[in-house]
Amino acid sequence: MISLKFPNNEVREFPENITALEVAKTLSPRLAKEALCASINGKLIDLSQKISESGEFRLYTFEDDEGKDVFRHSSAHLMAQAVKRLFPKTKLAIGPAIKDGFYYDFDPEESFSPEDLEKIEAEMEKIVKEDLPIERFVLSRDEAIKFFEEKGEIYKVELVKDIPEGVEISFYRQGEFVDLCTGPHVPSTGYLKAFKLLNIAGAYWRGNEKNKMLQRIYGVSFPKKSMLTDYLNFLEEAKKRDHRKIGQELDLFSLQEEGPGFPFFHPKGMVIRNELENFWREKHRLAGYQEIKTPIILNRELWERSGHWAHYKENMYFTKIDDQDYAIKPMNCPGSILVYKNKLHSYREFPIRLAELGLVHRHELSGVLHGLMRVRCFTQDDAHIFMLPEQVKDEIIGVINLIDEFYRLFGFEYHVELSTRPENSMGSDELWELATNSLKEALEERGLPYKINEGDGAFYGPKIDFHLKDCLGRTWQCGTIQLDFQMPEKFDLTYIGEDGQKHRPVMIHRVVFGSIERFIGILIEHYAGAFPVWLSPVQVRVITVAERHREYGQEIYQKLFNQGVRVELDDRNETIGYKIREGQMQKIPYLLIVGDKEIEQGSVAVRKRGVGDLGQKPFAEFIEELLAEIREKR
């Protein structure tokens, strides 16, 4: 017999070699029906796997991330099987689960067309109806290589050869289809009830542009048709809110072929950017930060000292000046460190908070560039805090409170993740443990729930990541707090302590927006271009009914302009309906209509975005309410 402990701490006895699915059936018929995979002592297993050891046992459904990944990965295999049936000469590369779906990379004899997706979907439906069992088996390295060589699967042969010695080489079979895979997978193809193939894209083999370009087919899948319908509706809404589309329509920014990944901000886009930066500056001033500006290009010696040359070089751009190597900065921290190091500091000055809206450049492959969300140059709202060890917790809590204030202004909910030491890192185990525990203590004292994100910290320290949730329920990683004991050591940073001796300060790296460009992209999609009044590029448009109302319209325009309102005057010889519709299309918060009655009464007819006609108002009353709305950032 074996003992299995369940998530509710209940322990039960079972016969040895019972399968995970059989365990599920003893718990609940519904759970057995919905379960997709299981785990024993933290290791994910197929439902068909026999359990021969005691330990902690858990089942996963589509409600769990683990269940979603298994379902989507099985869907990728389903698609690959359909492709091989329809296009037998196609070679298989890789097909993982990804956030919200799956993909598979293929090397077809002839390029796939959008029409082919319909054929592939139809074949997938047939395979689902066949309800083929999905079975795991193992081969030796030589057997695995021979198996794929005989099938002409050159990419799979390469993958097998790269598997380290001593690692088990597992496969999954469903009907005539076999794929190299660690698993786990759902028990049969009949589980994969609802799916949709979305699009075809190019992808280099192994992400290396020196390799062959393959065709990647993306798809989504769900256990119920209703869930698929809901998701496709969500995609339609997301398309309407695409910041690239809205940015073009509202003339906010553009992306030019002369500079892929380098966005151009237009006058209206600069209004949004400047408002965000002005707000950022004022809040940081009140929170005790001092703003600095550091150079974009610094020499190789600096980046070697900081560790970026060894750990981040593939993401950097380089140039030569007077035969010396220089790099365009990918991060602001070394520049901030040089500002700190420029003079001697006393413990009485701490904490020292240096903030910078710094332009950074990072090398991104052209295939991953995406509007403002993934670019090659962006402005990072960095700050670096130098402090005494005993000030660490209070400073982290202070940064958390500042980030919370920013996000709540825009109506964002968020969750927090604590990212720990990555494989490619610098520093001792002791310093990493000290830094990680300091972040945990601050989060717990602040009462913020968090989840651990293993191995996703920066190379110089662990970090807290803030993930925003937008109006469509999507999450975006923006704010970050990183605790760093490494850089002060690398740059020999010191302060004079109370004892008159030199000591090493502790350093925090933190951002609120993250990338200003990316945050603007998120805001465009969150608001669908209908920004709150204080952020809107044009806050009011004055619309005249006829030629004779032009003088009064100009008077209203001038009064608003003199009060600092961003205002436009539309006195064109067009119909009033046309001018109102155009103002609505441009998502202007307030349209003021002026005609005979308004001139007579010294009023304006107000139309508010999203509300409609508010009727006539005395102009003095309207401007008082408008200025209050702007001032209070409502």
Curated annotation (Swiss-Prot):
Q: List the EC numbers from the record.
A: 6.1.1.3
Essential cofactor(s):
Zn(2+)
Which SMART domains does its entry note? tRNA_SAD
One GO MF annotation is: metal ion binding
Where is each TGS domain found? 1-61
Q: Does the keyword Glycoprotein apply?
A: no
Q: Which reaction does it catalyse?
A: tRNA(Thr) + L-threonine + ATP = L-threonyl-tRNA(Thr) + AMP + diphosphate + H(+)
Please give the residue ranges the record annotates as the region Catalytic.
Answer: 242-532
Q: Looking at its record, which EC class is this enzyme?
A: ligase
Q: What is its main location?
A: cytoplasm
Q: Where in the cell is it found?
A: Cytoplasm
One Gene Ontology cellular component term attached to this UniProt record is: cytoplasm
Q: Any keyword Cell division?
A: no
Q: Which GO terms describe its biological process?
A: threonyl-tRNA aminoacylation
The record's comment on cofactor binding reads: Binds 1 zinc ion per subunit.
One Pfam short name: tRNA-synt_2b
Family the UniProt entry places it in: Belongs to the class-II aminoacyl-tRNA synthetase family.
Q: Which PANTHER family match?
A: THREONINE--TRNA LIGASE, CHLOROPLASTIC_MITOCHONDRIAL 2, THREONINE-TRNA LIGASE
Record NCBIfam families = thrS
Q: What does this protein do?
A: Catalyzes the attachment of threonine to tRNA(Thr) in a two-step reaction: L-threonine is first activated by ATP to form Thr-AMP and then transferred to the acceptor end of tRNA(Thr). Also edits incorrectly charged L-seryl-tRNA(Thr).
Describe the subunit structure: Homodimer.
Its protein name is Threonine--tRNA ligase
Species name? Carboxydothermus hydrogenoformans (strain ATCC BAA-161 / DSM 6008 / Z-2901)
